Every structure is written in C-alpha cells, then in structure tokens.
Curated annotation (Swiss-Prot):
The chain crosses the membrane at residues 453-470. Zn(2+) binds at H125, E128, H226. Its EC number is 3.4.17.-. This is Carboxypeptidase SOL1. Belongs to the peptidase M14 family. It is found in: Endosome membrane. One of its GO terms (biological process) is proteolysis. InterPro entries: CarboxyPept-like_regulatory, Peptidase_M14, Peptidase_M14_domain. Pfam families: Peptidase_M14. It comes from Arabidopsis thaliana (Mouse-ear cress). PROSITE patterns: CARBOXYPEPT_ZN_1, CARBOXYPEPT_ZN_2, PEPTIDASE_M14. Residues 1-25 form the signal peptide. Residues 26-452 are extracellular.
C-alpha cells in the first residue's frame, strides 16, 4: 500500500504540473545587490555642470508650453478619449499641493499582470520642460496608433507603461530648477556612497512620492527626461571617492545596450562628437550623489536611464515638434526593448503548483531580480547574443539553474522549484524499510513484480498520458510564442 501511495503522490504532482496557472510572464517577443533592501538617505552634493544657477527663462520663452492647469486638463482629456487603454492616477502632491499625475497605458490598465512595467518621468527640474511636452505627445501617439502600428500595439498588449509628465510642477511654475523648497529633486534620493540624512520624513514630498510608487509597483525599467545636453546617461552616477572616472555598475553591459537603443534610434544623438555613440557613464561625465537613477537600480530593482534630450534646456515652443520627431522612435524603442529581449518567466512550487515569489540571479552579474509577489513573474534585462546561466531560488525550496542562449529575441524560462523536504521524498523514504532485502531493487521493478500489478499499471498509464498532454500543452504555448518570435524553457 505504501508503494501505491507513492504512485498516487506521483499522479497528484503530475496533475499539479498539468494544471499550473496558464498566465504567462509576458515580456518577450520571440557582497550581492538586492534591490529594495535598505533605507539609506542623504542630502544632495552639488552636481556642478547643471546645478549652477542659471538665468530664469523669460515669460516670453514660456509661451506655447502648457501650464500646470493645461497639463492636468490635457491628461484628463486623454484618459477620457483613450479610456480603453489608459487610466489617470496621482502618486502624491508637490510642496504646493499640485497632484503628481500619472497616465498608465495598457490593454488592462490598473490590473496586475505578469508583464513588465516601464515608467517615464519628465520635468524633474522645473526649468527643463521639454520632457513634459514630449511625454504627453507620446501618450497621444500610442493612443492614435496602437490599432495600426505594430510597435504601439506591442507596447499596449505586453507592457504597463506609466507616464508622469511633471515631477516638479512647482519648479516649472516659477521657472526654476529646484522645487518650491529650493531642493534639487535629483539630489534628494538615498545614495550608496553617502548615506547622510537617514530620516525619510526630511525628504521632499515629491521624492517620497516616487519612493512609495516604486514600493507599490515593481518597475522593470525607467527613464527620466532632462534638457541641456544630448546624451543617454547610465549608472553609476557617482564614485566612492567623489572623483570623476568611469564607474561601472554590475549590469554595465545591459545599461550600455539600453542607452544605445535610445541614442541609435534618435535622429542625431549617436553622432555626438562629445559622447561616443551618444551615451555616457554618469560618473565619467560628472559625478552626482542622491540621484534618482542609481537609487532606482539599487533600491527599486529598476533599470533607469537619464536622458538628456535637447541641447537647450528651455527651447522655443516652436521647436517642440522637431524635438518630438527626433525622439519619438527612441522613446518607443526603449519601452519595446522590455518585450523584445531579455529572459522572462515565472517561478512555481512543485508541491502546491502555485506562483512562488523568489529571486533570480545570473552568474557573473552581482545583482538580484525579485519575482513579483502576485504571479511570481520576473523580467531580466540582458544583452542579446550571449549565453547566460540563470538561477531561481526561494527560501525552503531547492534552487534551479538553466543555461540560456539569448539571441535577438526574448526567451521565456519558467522555473518549478522542489521543496527542500518534499512530500514525495518522504513517501520514498517511508516505502523503504531498512530490514527489507528488496529495498535495493529498483522501485518500479518491485511494483511490477508484486500483487498490485493491475492498479500500478493503470496509474502508470494515467501518468504517462498526462505527461503526453502536458508536452502537447507546452508545445502549443511554444507555437503561440513563436508567432511572436519568443523561445520558451521550463526548468
């Protein structure tokens, strides 16, 4: 009977595998850093190049730009016009009480899905307003084209895109870099090298709103839009000794890849004579501390770029259409990169068949990606054209490792983890009495030579049949994913 119970256990495990939740982690068309840990903070150290006081833009120059009220109305009008693929929400308020509005674009806005999330933030500095104008144009372009343009459709169906045109509405209203408390918001985040000011309550309301936002939503990647140069900037932004030199983060290759996506899609960013390929490591350009970019990567688990998208901080409004034309393709391709490449998947427990929030690491890269709490989906951005050893783990379960060759298209790698002490293992042990001479025989041989042959054979046939159905299901999923050029692996 103990052997019969073993096969019953085997049958149950197979059924669980067969009926695993059918939600796929979408994100693809064919000491260790643990993001989210720690609570360091700091008050900013001046980044000399753009932190210098500059003349306030004239009132004449601001004509043609949306006021804060204009922007709010435009965002509300947008979500009414495009209600099927968008929603409007606020993550908090500025010092002067203006809502920090965000537009979410997705085929299922407001719902939790096993998809990567991307955020764009504009107007971090009040006197750099181009981003707020371009981000609203981006939202409208996607709304107008997602039914007819493949790239727009890909983004709507496979990504949750969050667009915040203005993080610093107070600074914009007075045409100044800093917020209403005269604090540079891009120097107000926790920093890995200078953890001064550990009191969260001493941070600016805009900063706290961003930090809370990233606790609520697990973003895969992000970009902030700035003005005053033409370059895609990536981590690290600072160095431990405050000197200026190239200081690479663990995912340096991936960040360079993402930065090149933007610069090479841009009309002329990659042609820069100052920055090779139109990209730069922040610390090699000029170090800053307390920046949003590094904080996103360390504490938020989010790959963020700082995009300088116009040589002039506050160009004439008549130039906005040209700047939009130069940046539109770059902005779209950067978001689409989340689903075009990388390794994506979900983690399950074998014993219960449920999503298992865990950790994913890649050998040789000192960085950990966390799977989402709800669907246990993960989205690991990596450079195409390389082989990676990917490991999934979760407390109380045996880790699993697989080798992935990442070509030009994304790969799905789902992991099914076995408990450290599984019920099946206990049944195996209980079925073997050390005083029994036959314990050395193969288990299946024992079954087929004892009196339970008929029942055992029936169970065996059922298990084989379910495995056959499971293989067909996997092949069908692979066929569907191949239609979008995505490979799939189950480990």
């Amino acid at each position: 009977m103990s052997k019969l119970r073993f096969f019953q256990s085997l049958l149950i495990s197979t059924v669980i595998c067969f009926f695993l939740p059918s939600i796929n982690a979408r994100g693809g068309h064919s000491d260790h850093i643990h993001p989210g840990d720690g609570n360091y903070s700091f008050h900013g150290i001046v980044r000399h190049l753009f932190a210098q006081e500059e003349p306030t833009p004239s009132l004449e120059l601001t004509r043609g730009y949306m006021t804060n009220d204009d922007l709010e109305k435009a965002m509300k009008d947008f979500t009414k016009r495009c209600s099927k693929i968008s929603r409007l929400y606020s993550i908090g308020k500025s010092v002067n009480g203006f809502p920090l509005w965000v537009i979410e674009i997705s085929d299922r806005p407001g719902e939790i899905e096993a998809e990567p999330a991307f955020k764009y933030i504009g107007n971090v500095h009040g006197d750099e307003p181009v981003g707020r104008e371009l981000l609203l144009r981006l939202a409208n372009w996607i709304c107008d084209n997602y039914k007819k343009d493949p790239l727009a459709q890909m983004i709507v169906e496979n990504v949750h895109l969050h667009i915040m045109p203005s993080l610093n509405p107070d600074g914009f209203s007075i045409r100044k870099r800093n917020n209403a408390n005269n604090v540079d918001l891009n120097r107000d985040f926790p920093d890995q090298f200078f953890p001064f000011n550990d009191d969260l309550n001493l941070r600016q309301p805009e900063t706290k709103a961003i930090m809370t936002w990233l606790r609520d939503i697990r973003f895969t990647a992000s970009a902030t839009l700035h003005g005053g140069a033409l370059v895609a900037n990536f981590p690290w932004d600072g160095t431990e000794d405050k000197r200026k030199y190239y200081y690479a983060c663990p995912d340096d290759e991936t960040f360079r890849f993402l930065a090149r996506i933007y610069s090479k899609s841009h009309r002329n960013m990659s042609l820069s004579k100052e920055f090779e390929e139109g990209i730069t490591n922040g610390a090699s350009w000029y170090p800053i501390y307390g920046g949003m970019q590094d904080w996103n990567y360390i504490y938020g688990g989010c790959f963020e770029l700082t995009l300088e998208i116009s040589d002039n901080k506050w160009p004439k409004a008549s130039e906005l259409s040209t700047i939009w034309d130069y940046n539109r393709k770059s902005m779209l391709n950067l978001v689409a990169s989340l689903v075009k490449t990388g390794v994506h998947g979900r983690i399950f427990s074998l014993d219960k068949g449920k999503p298992l929030p865990g950790l994913v690491v890649v050998k040789g890269i000192n960085y950990t990606v966390k799977a989402h709490q709800t669907y246990a989906d993960y989205h690991r951005l990596l450079v195409p054209g390389q082989k990676y050893e990917v490991t999934a783990s979760s407390p109380g379960y045996k880790s699993k490792t697989t080798t992935v060759w990442l070509g030009e298209n994304a790969v799905t790698a789902d992991f099914i983890l076995i408990p450290e002490t599984s019920s099946r293992g206990n049944q195996l042990r209980s079925s073997c009495d050390c005083s029994c001479k036959s314990c050395g025989q193969p288990l299946l041989t024992q079954f087929f030579t004892e009196t339970n042959n008929g029942i055992t054979l029936t169970l065996f046939v059922v298990v084989v049949f379910l495995c056959f159905l499971l293989q067909r299901r996997v092949r069908f999923n692979l066929w569907k994913q191949r239609q979008s050029s995505r490979r799939s692996i189950t480990v």
